[in-house]
Amino acid sequence: MKIFGTDGVRGRAGVKLTPMFVMRLGIAAGLYFKKHSKTDKILIGKDTRKSGYMVENALVSALTSIGYNVIQIGPMPTPAIAFLTEDMRCDAGIMISASHNPFEDNGIKFFNSYGYKLKEEEERAIEEIFHNEELLHSSYKVGESVGNAKRIDDVIGRYIVHLKHSFPKHLNLQSLRIVLDTANGAAYKVAPVVFSELGADVLVINDEPNGCNINEQCGALHPNQLSQEVKKYRADLGFAFDGDADRLVVVDNLGNIVHGDKLLGVLGVYQKSKNALSSQAIVATNMSNLALKEYLKSQDLELKHCTIGDKFVSECMQLNKANFGGEQSGHIIFSDYAKTGDGLVCALQVSALVLESKLASSVALNPFELYPQSLVNLDIQKKLPLESLKGYSALLKELDKLEIRHLIRYSGTENKLRILLEAKDEKLLELKMQELKEFFEGHLC
């Protein structure tokens, strides 16, 4: 049975993520990390979901039972776990979060000792241990060999200092008015402190988590409230994070939501202008707009494509010796400062770009026009092999004939089918998207 999806393990808390399941997974992961253990320490953080306590306690029980010493740091962004795992010399880091999903869901993401997400072969190795009853039941420690657990509440300061170091030393934010939407999630403590200490005039919204309101009509998936607040507050910029703050959505001074591909393009060129790129390659996923590739080419930069998922972006960056890349959804990686997508690092770089451009953000963050694109996330009941659906191949051939770029895939974390179409003719695009929706609703819903 496959346990891992595209971003760790995710599911409904108490349904898939039961205490017994989590304990078993924790033991399996711990035994895998033991093979390369240097410190016998594992770091655990979480977002603000109510079920995080249940999942955390199950993981602590599992890991201490096989001899690991566990450091619990409470609600922190996913990229903070990646950073602190390496910074505190731990064998591994674990983030308890379902990212942008509703509060009823939860998830578990693993990081190696260098702060990188696990590769697929590492996940498969953990799955093999998970299904090995004999190995699991023969691994418990007794007496003094049992591990301990301790909670540390002040590591937030380390991450804040790290974030501030990512911001250019010759700049400050005193001339910027910024609205932050922390999605009642993991960034609710960190984000306001970082921007305030760098001098910004800050307004914070959705920063009162109660365990059940994470991502609820707020944050990166619902930036309309942020857009309204930016206009009302006459702010220069607005930043919306998702539940675990590895994703960023930017709103300009006019209240417009900045497209992720425009963000990738303008940030890539900004990094080049500072001689901060390690290569001429910038990494993006197959969902990126063709206009991004053309824009980067005009700036003597090369776009490298990879599979969807920020861990695949990271792997492709390493392969191409690149230090900048991301997804149009807002997972953007500056690998000089973060091994995974970090919404706060990205927000600081956007702020620096706007400051140095001496332009309004609505101008500075709008470097090129996009080709018409349509993205639909279709709720489905079943995940059948797409190639097995009668008429599917003919549909794709027709799209190719009409020169409509297409990317159709199942979500790795939810019961959704993601359909992306791109073409120069917007009306044709809308027509074909409706046809595709009706086709898949008839076969998968």
UniProtKB/Swiss-Prot annotation:
It catalyses: alpha-D-glucosamine 1-phosphate = D-glucosamine 6-phosphate. InterPro entries: A-D-PHexomutase_a/b/a-I, A-D-PHexomutase_a/b/a-I/II/III, A-D-PHexomutase_a/b/a-II, A-D-PHexomutase_a/b/a-III, A-D-PHexomutase_C, A-D-PHexomutase_C_sf, A-D-PHexomutase_CS, Alpha-D-phosphohexomutase_SF. GO terms for biological process: carbohydrate metabolic process; peptidoglycan biosynthetic process; UDP-N-acetylglucosamine biosynthetic process. Keywords: Isomerase, Magnesium, Metal-binding, Phosphoprotein. GO terms for cellular component: cytosol. Catalyzes the conversion of glucosamine-6-phosphate to glucosamine-1-phosphate. HAMAP family: GlmM_B (MF_01554_B). This is Phosphoglucosamine mutase.
